[in-house]
Amino acid sequence: AQRKTMFQPFEKETGIKIVEASPTDYGKLKAMVQSGNVEWDLVDVGDLNVVAGAKDNLLEPLDYQAIDTKGVFPQVIHKYGIGTIYYSTVLAYSTKKYAKGDHPKTWAQFWDVGKFPGPRTMRNNPLDNLEFALLADDVPMDKVYPMDVERAFRSIDRIKPHVNVWWTTGAQPAQLLADGEVELATSWNGRIFAIQKQGARAGLEWNQGKLQWDSWVIPRGSKNKDGATKFIAWSTQPKPQAAIVNEIPYGPVNQRAFEFIGAQAARDMPTAPDNAKRQVMVDPAWWGEHRNVLVERWNAWLLK
């Protein structure tokens, strides 16, 4: 979707060619910058990696003289990064198993394997899972942060034996649902809409989802900082933002994009008012401080 709605139109308009290198990997970014051999000029990272990258001195500060932030939501603007799109991690389910309305609607129900039996998949990462574990343990949405990590791990201990696959790429949970290998999943909302378009019998539940965003960052030592800055300035404007959202229902980071977004796409976005109010907004600062320790703990926990 990015290639069609952003990269190609930007190339056509400016003559600046964008060469994609995938996937984004924080470890690789760190190694590049620290070795002085920076191959990437611009990187699409999760919101937490902006905080981590700034802390690790891996990023160039953005030039906000050249980037017009009019209409951009304040929480996605950072000295070292700016939002690309909003997305949600949600509870997804097989509509073959669950007719509309009788699927789990909370993480407590996802955890309830007696009432909702069946194979499950969750992300192989503490991100998202710890929030969902607290919600499953009846922590109110507005009290999730700062997280009670011990309580979260006690809660996730209970679901661990019932998770058939710990997914590592965004495409995986949607594919597992489409193939009928699992009946319940945590997934990024756009991936579920994509398989629905292809006819897969899958649905998603916005309630207790986790709302977050991706960001553009420029690695320290980028060889084409000017080109990267031009792309960021272009891509955060209303029309490019609307173009990507009309293609796949993520949320624009620029409020002015709503003028150019179709009614159906607007309803399906994670930031649609009815959807956003039922979700937890990520706290990147909290994760930026605790992430490394929790990833180590998670990896050890998974092996137990």
Where are these regions (language model features)?
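Extracytoplasmic ligand-binding site segments that recognize negatively charged/polar headgroups
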Residues: 1-4, 38-178
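Mature extracytoplasmic/periplasmic domains
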Residues: 219-282
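Early extracytoplasmic/lumenal segment of secretory-pathway proteins
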Residues: 1-53
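A bilobed periplasmic-binding-protein/Venus flytrap-type ligand-binding module shared by bacterial periplasmic
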Residues: 92-97, 134-138, 213-227, 243, ...
